Amino acid sequence: MDKVVRMSSEKGVVIFSKSSCCMSYAVQVLFQDLGVHPTVHEIDKDPECREIEKALMRLGCSTPVPAIFVGGKLIGSTNEVMSLHLSGSLVPLVKPFQANLC
């Protein structure tokens, strides 16, 4: 679990994904559209994939991927991110991590 905690705190927005997961891709595109460049860890390419999945579940993820962290804090999966976005709460949450687009 230490590895997951370390990885989730590396950058402002971190997504744990699998290369074949279309929902992970959709979340990545959403963040990019908001001017955020998330760090994406494709866990299916990691030899410790099973351990990472178990650690994500222990941290409270309802599904192992996508698991989205903002500022080192677990936000959740696609449903939680989309709910935050639709309610207008996602942009203020990621504002500190938006790229300078000037």
UniProtKB/Swiss-Prot annotation:
Keywords: 2Fe-2S, Cytoplasm, Iron, Iron-sulfur, Metal-binding, Redox-active center. It comes from the Eukaryota. Gene3D superfamilies: Glutaredoxin (3.40.30.10). CDD domains: GRX_GRXh_1_2_like (cd03419). GO terms for molecular function: 2 iron, 2 sulfur cluster binding; metal ion binding. InterPro entries: GlrX-like_pln_2 (IPR011905), Glutaredoxin (IPR002109), Thioredoxin-like_sf (IPR036249). The keyword 4Fe-4S does not apply. It is found in: Cytoplasm. [2Fe-2S] cluster binds at residue 21. Belongs to the glutaredoxin family. CC-type subfamily. This is Monothiol glutaredoxin-S9.
